[in-house]
Each structure stands twice: as C-alpha cells, then as structure tokens.
Amino acid sequence: MKKWSSTDLGAAADPLQKDTCPDPLDGDPNSRPPPAKPQLSTAKSRTRLFGKGDSEEAFPVDCPHEEGELDSCPTITVSPVITIQRPGDGPTGARLLSQDSVAASTEKTLRLYDRRSIFEAVAQNNCQDLESLLLFLQKSKKHLTDNEFKDPETGKTCLLKAMLNLHDGQNTTIPLLLEIARQTDSLKELVNASYTDSYYKGQTALHIAIERRNMALVTLLVENGADVQAAAHGDFFKKTKGRPGFYFGELPLSLAACTNQLGIVKFLLQNSWQTADISARDSVGNTVLHALVEVADNTADNTKFVTSMYNEILMLGAKLHPTLKLEELTNKKGMTPLALAAGTGKIGVLAYILQREIQEPECRHLSRKFTEWAYGPVHSSLYDLSCIDTCEKNSVLEVIAYSSSETPNRHDMLLVEPLNRLLQDKWDRFVKRIFYFNFLVYCLYMIIFTMAAYYRPVDGLPPFKMEKTGDYFRVTGEILSVLGGVYFFFRGIQYFLQRRPSMKTLFVDSYSEMLFFLQSLFMLATVVLYFSHLKEYVASMVFSLALGWTNMLYYTRGFQQMGIYAVMIEKMILRDLCRFMFVYIVFLFGFSTAVVTLIEDGKNDSLPSESTSHRWRGPACRPPDSSYNSLYSTCLELFKFTIGMGDLEFTENYDFKAVFIILLLAYVILTYILLLNMLIALMGETVNKIAQESKNIWKLQRAITILDTEKSFLKCMRKAFRSGKLLQVGYTPDGKDDYRWCFRVDEVNWTTWNTNVGIINEDPGNCEGVKRTLSFSLRSSRVSGRHWKNFALVPLLREASARDRQSAQPEEVYLRQFSGSLKPEDAEVFKSPAASGEK
C-alpha cells in the first residue's frame, strides 16, 4: 500500500469531497446519497474507520452501547476515503488508505437531528446529545422554530418541551437551546413560540416558567426577549362551565398574580429589559385586577391571598403610574373589578374593596374608607360611593339586586357595609313614603275592581247599555280596572326586556312580577271577550280578581315581619308544594284510570244493595243519576279521599269488588296518610331552615323595590335624593383636591377597636372639635349620611397620630414578685422604659 503524506492527502481532500463524496446536508434532500453505516457511539471526541479485514465486533472504546443497539439519530461520518487503482487491476484491486494516514486526515463528523431526538434530549436534561445541534443547524441552514422540529399537533417547540421537563427546578438544556437560537438568528422566535392547537393556544415558555413558579427561568426568558404581553387564549385558559381549565387573564402578569407569586409580579413590572403593562386587558377586556376577582372562590385561604395580591398590585400601580386609575378600568361588559366581584358573588373580595383603607401617604388616595373618629369600639367612617350608588352605570347595588338567582352570596352581600346602611338610608329618607302611597293606591284600585266585578250585569250579553245612574259608576270602575291592567302589562313588558330573566330566575326572583303580569293578561283577555259578546269574560275577570288580591302580598315588603312571612310562603310554594303536587297528580291520575276502568254504568242498577236502598228510601228521594264512568268524575271523587271526605261505596257499578276496595285503600294510604303528612313535615322543616335566609331574601326584595323606585325618578330628581355628600378627602397624586361622594357610617367593632386609639378627636362625634383644631367647616351629627355639611376629611389627624406613635416610648409592665400574701400593695404595677432594661 502506498503511503501519502499529510500534505498530499490534504491537497487531495477537497476535490474528493466535492466530486466523489458530497456533503449529505447540501443540496436537495431527496437527492442525497444513502448514509453510511451508522456509528454506534454518541461520543464526538474519537471516531474510528474500520477498513477491509477489520473485525465487525470492534467498537469504539467509549461506546456505551451493546451490539445491535442503535441510536435513534445516527452519526454520519463524512471523510476523504482515498482508493488507489493500479493499471491492470480489476475492480477488486482497489486498496484503502492505511489507518495511520486516515487518522491524520481532516475528518468532518455530523449528527442528524430530528424532532424526536431533540425532544428526548431536552426531556432527559441531556446536553451531550445536543453538542452537534448547532453545527447541524448551521450546515443545514435550519432553525429550531422550523415546522419539522415542532409537534405537528400542538406546535410545541423544544424549548417548551424543556420547560415542561424540569429536574429539581432546572433543565440545563434551556440555556443551551437559547444560545443555539441566538447563533442561528432565531432567538426571539424560539423564546416567543407558542402552542398552536385550540386547547393551549398562545401559551409560551414564559407562561410555563411562571406556572412552574421558577423565578430564575422567568428572568432568563425576559433577558432573552420573551414577550411579557403574550396572551394564552386557548380553550383551557377560558372560563367555560363544565370544562376543565384555569382562567387567569391570559397574560403573564395575570398568571403570576393569580398563582400568588408577588416576586414575579414585581419583576415583570419593574425589570430593566421589558416591563409588563399593568393596565393590559385580555380577550374579554379583563385586567389583572379582574383576573384576581375571577379566581377568588370565597374560601378563607383563597380570599386572603387574593385580597393581599390585589392590594399589592394596586399600590404598585399607584407608585409606577401615579395618574393611572387602575381600579376604574372596565372590561368589555362595562364592569369594574368591584362590580365584577359583586356580580360573581365574591363576598370576601367585595368587602375588602369596599372597606379598603391604606395608611401609606403616597397611596392614601386608593382608600375607599376613611375613619373620621374612634372612641373605644365605636368609630365613624366615611365610605366612597363611587361605583356603588345607582347614579353610575353598572353600580354595585344594581349588579347585586338584579343579578341572577344563581349568584352565590347574593343575599349576604347586601349586608356588607356601606351597602346595608346605604339602602336603609334611602328607605328612611324617601322610598318608604312612596312605597306606602303606592300601597294605598293599589288597595283603592282593588276595591274599585272588586265593586265593578260584583255589580256586573247578569242578564243579557255584553257589552251592556247604561240605563241607570249606578251603571255610570260601574262603567267608571270598569275603565279604571282596565287602565290598571294596561299599566301592569306594560310594566311587566318593561321588566322582562330589561332583566331578561331565565326560566329559573322567572320562578324564583320574578315571582311577584310574573303574578302581576298574569293579572294584567287576564284583565286584557276580559276586555277582548267582553267586546266579543261572549259571556265567558266573567271567567277571565274572576281569575284577574283573585290574582289581584293575591298580589297584595307584594306590599308586605314594606313591613319586616310580614315580609319575612310572605317570603316563607313563597319558598314553601316553590319548594315543598310544587314537589308535593307533582307526586300527588301522578298518584291521582294513576289510580283514577285504574278505578274508572273497573266502573261500568248500569251494572248493578237492578239489584241495589242493602245500604243503598236504605240510604235512598222514601218517596221523595231518588238515587243520583251521576255517572262515574268518566275520568273527570272519578278524579273529583278520589280528591275527596285526599281531604278525608271520600266514601268507599260512592258507586256500586263495578266488577271485582275486592280489587276496587284495595285500590281505594292504597290510594288513601299513599295520599291522605303519607303525602299529606309528609308535606306538613317538609313545611315545618323549611320554616326552621330558611328562617335567617328569609330575612336576607326580604332585604333583597326590599332593595329591589328601593332601586325600582329610584329608577322611576327623573335624572334631576335622582340627584336631589342622592345619599351622601361631596367631600374633600385629601389630594390626588398630581396635587389636586380629591373630592369624592362619601357616605357616613357609625360602626361598633369589638375585635379591632384597640388598634384605632390613635384616630381620636378631643370631642368624638362632635365635628366642632375638628373644626377648632383644623379650621374645617363641620356640623355636629352622628346620623349616617344626613345633617352634615361639606368638610375636608382629616388625613392630618392620621399623620399626627402616626407621629405620636413614633415618639411614644414603649414601656414594660410587670408585677411585684408574689410573696405569698394577698395584700393590696402586692398588686402594685411597675412601669419602666423598655430600652433601659430595668426591672
């Protein structure tokens, strides 16, 4: 074998690679030559070429595999294989170069990568398998974000795969992948690549890092250009009833907030690479505050973290963007976070927002509650009425009162201050007078309607002529009755158009409105039948009359005891009586069909029984001619058994007397004995169960009445009857006077009253004391929301009390050592400054 020098070999290498062994990664992939036998080693440091005559069992020294085991991705060795053909030699006369000369030659080792091999490497946290990935991508002019390296179903990239396979919170392939993407000019595309399937669409590596609670990876991704505004809007991230998923507001900032990661929240808002927009909205218009309200579930732990995170984000927003009113931003439904909390029944979050009081001077303008004075457990507070009162669209009162019956804690939310006192103030000032007046008018209307119906003409067909003086009064009463029916009809139409209640809400919350609407329908039907010359107008009229007197219960809302009693009646009708009637009708119809099948008219007319002949003896008495061979008559007869007035021998026209008696006895046992007594027991249990609930429901019904009355006013009248006063509570971040419409509430709190000792005036409850010290114009009053003029709140009092707390020296209090006696001097209390350490 002729040996060539390394210089000669190097000179011959390039033309050989170009002409005889082209690079398999260049050119059309379909025209590539088949690869050589794959190497069995994944090591890159040493590669051996086995020439003719070498043993097939020879493996590289560092090969970890056994014979017959193949890598999923082979290593292709492309080397300048030089053959020498002597003149006269045949095809078998070719000679391979010696191994020494081959080892000295220039070799080029490349490993082919596909999606499967890369995914396996990153899932196993194996950086060694990715050492040749950069060379492969550069040679093939490909990128990690190409479709061939993505999951065809989900669009998952190798970076997303690595983020999902962390080992002890780390995956060393992630920095390697980012560096490879940087050198292939695809870093931004790889970092921001997201899922493409409909289920996880939009989720990026940053979302996964936040969900995995990994601050280091979040920092790494943001440093490398991760989009902090990327929205994950797949089906899994939408709030769909009955489907698994987690709604967090789509954005990375919202995800960090909803998973209680304050550190990541602060990093996203304050990092030096790309800061998140705190006012950004998702596809439904929700901000990060809306998202926090959505994830609240009214449990103690959840409410604690949600309110804490809500407060931190609100204060961060005030510090980063002083003029931004983050809490006033609305979603696509026009709801603020406060209104959303009310509409979804998040009572813990609602109470926190309504009663939020912040002490920090730079964030004090975020407070909605301002304590004016405190004396022991009693303190007077001013509540901001913005977004609460009905003067604004989507106010909290309207959202709670007009929300669906399926809204949790709907009745309890009205007990949260200041909502409870605000509704009571509206009722006391003007609503109750209007309500009582309407009650008197309705009573007068029903009396007129009753008189017109009672003195209706009996002879002839309608319409009737007016011949006497009394007829004019009767017609006047009829006209007034019809006008009342028309009014109730259009009021019902307006109610249904505005509220659009569901079927369940219609029978639960719209109970009275539906009865008034039915009353109006019967009245209008009466008018149509009357002028159609049909005497059947009387049937429709009496139904309207009966419903009219029944609807008198609506006005029991103005009286607490009667209102609670009416609520109990309504609940028993809708819960217990409806279920009883369903089962009873089934029994009644079933046994009636069985009994009527046994009855045959005229079966025993010729042979009257002894009891029958004795019952009807006498010349003037004859057996009744009524027939029970009809379902209607049999149902009426069986109904008598239900109320204990039935007769087992109400007829003799039947076959199989034993079967007949057994059917009647079974019916009596199931209805009169079982169902009726069960109904009584259920009603008693319902009364005990919903005693407190009925009071809350009555308050809700009265709240609806208050709001309906207020909405019936003109806009100018609404402002005149508005509760509260316009007050200056401090200063806005830009230095302007902060005026708010506030409502005053005096409260007693025995839990935290000892923490308010610094918030005290010389004359608590006497506004003149504040006037003397701060030159504010006040009026002495303790009545909530009434009889007090505009005055500036006392933030200076808080600052003064804070200075007092800072200047006060803490003292240690201890007793004299017990000496065994019970003399008064043994109870002497000693005080000393804590700093001195003397005892």
Swiss-Prot record:
<feature type="modified residue" description="Phosphoserine; by PKC/PRKCE and PKC/PRKCZ">
    <location>
        <position position="801"/>
    </location>
</feature>
<feature type="region of interest" description="AD">
    <location>
        <begin position="685"/>
        <end position="713"/>
    </location>
</feature>
<feature type="repeat" description="ANK 4">
    <location>
        <begin position="250"/>
        <end position="277"/>
    </location>
</feature>
<dbReference type="GO" id="GO:0048266">
    <property type="term" value="P:behavioral response to pain"/>
</dbReference>
<keyword id="KW-0107">Calcium channel</keyword>
<feature type="transmembrane region" description="Helical; Name=S5">
    <location>
        <begin position="560"/>
        <end position="598"/>
    </location>
</feature>
<keyword id="KW-0966">Cell projection</keyword>
<dbReference type="Pfam" id="PF12796">
    <property type="entry name" value="Ank_2"/>
</dbReference>
<feature type="binding site">
    <location>
        <position position="165"/>
    </location>
    <ligand>
        <name>ATP</name>
    </ligand>
</feature>
<dbReference type="GO" id="GO:0050955">
    <property type="term" value="P:thermoception"/>
</dbReference>
<feature type="topological domain" description="Extracellular">
    <location>
        <begin position="456"/>
        <end position="472"/>
    </location>
</feature>
<feature type="transmembrane region" description="Helical; Name=S2">
    <location>
        <begin position="473"/>
        <end position="497"/>
    </location>
</feature>
<dbReference type="GO" id="GO:0004888">
    <property type="term" value="F:transmembrane signaling receptor activity"/>
</dbReference>
<keyword id="KW-0040">ANK repeat</keyword>
<dbReference type="GO" id="GO:0005516">
    <property type="term" value="F:calmodulin binding"/>
</dbReference>
<feature type="repeat" description="ANK 1">
    <location>
        <begin position="111"/>
        <end position="139"/>
    </location>
</feature>
<dbReference type="Pfam" id="PF00520">
    <property type="entry name" value="Ion_trans"/>
</dbReference>
<feature type="topological domain" description="Cytoplasmic">
    <location>
        <begin position="498"/>
        <end position="510"/>
    </location>
</feature>
<keyword id="KW-0406">Ion transport</keyword>
<dbReference type="GO" id="GO:0050965">
    <property type="term" value="P:detection of temperature stimulus involved in sensory perception of pain"/>
</dbReference>
<feature type="region of interest" description="Required for PIP2-mediated channel inhibition">
    <location>
        <begin position="778"/>
        <end position="793"/>
    </location>
</feature>
<keyword id="KW-0812">Transmembrane</keyword>
<dbReference type="GO" id="GO:0002024">
    <property type="term" value="P:diet induced thermogenesis"/>
</dbReference>
<keyword id="KW-0472">Membrane</keyword>
<dbReference type="GO" id="GO:0006629">
    <property type="term" value="P:lipid metabolic process"/>
</dbReference>
<keyword id="KW-0677">Repeat</keyword>
<feature type="binding site">
    <location>
        <begin position="200"/>
        <end position="203"/>
    </location>
    <ligand>
        <name>ATP</name>
    </ligand>
</feature>
<feature type="repeat" description="ANK 2">
    <location>
        <begin position="154"/>
        <end position="186"/>
    </location>
</feature>
<keyword id="KW-0407">Ion channel</keyword>
<dbReference type="GO" id="GO:0071468">
    <property type="term" value="P:cellular response to acidic pH"/>
</dbReference>
<keyword id="KW-0112">Calmodulin-binding</keyword>
<dbReference type="GO" id="GO:0005245">
    <property type="term" value="F:voltage-gated calcium channel activity"/>
</dbReference>
<feature type="transmembrane region" description="Helical; Name=S4">
    <location>
        <begin position="536"/>
        <end position="556"/>
    </location>
</feature>
<dbReference type="GO" id="GO:0035091">
    <property type="term" value="F:phosphatidylinositol binding"/>
</dbReference>
<dbReference type="InterPro" id="IPR036770">
    <property type="entry name" value="Ankyrin_rpt-contain_sf"/>
</dbReference>
<dbReference type="GO" id="GO:0002790">
    <property type="term" value="P:peptide secretion"/>
</dbReference>
<feature type="topological domain" description="Extracellular">
    <location>
        <begin position="653"/>
        <end position="656"/>
    </location>
</feature>
<dbReference type="GO" id="GO:0051289">
    <property type="term" value="P:protein homotetramerization"/>
</dbReference>
<feature type="transmembrane region" description="Helical; Name=S3">
    <location>
        <begin position="511"/>
        <end position="532"/>
    </location>
</feature>
<feature type="topological domain" description="Cytoplasmic">
    <location>
        <begin position="557"/>
        <end position="559"/>
    </location>
</feature>
<dbReference type="GO" id="GO:0050968">
    <property type="term" value="P:detection of chemical stimulus involved in sensory perception of pain"/>
</dbReference>
<keyword id="KW-0106">Calcium</keyword>
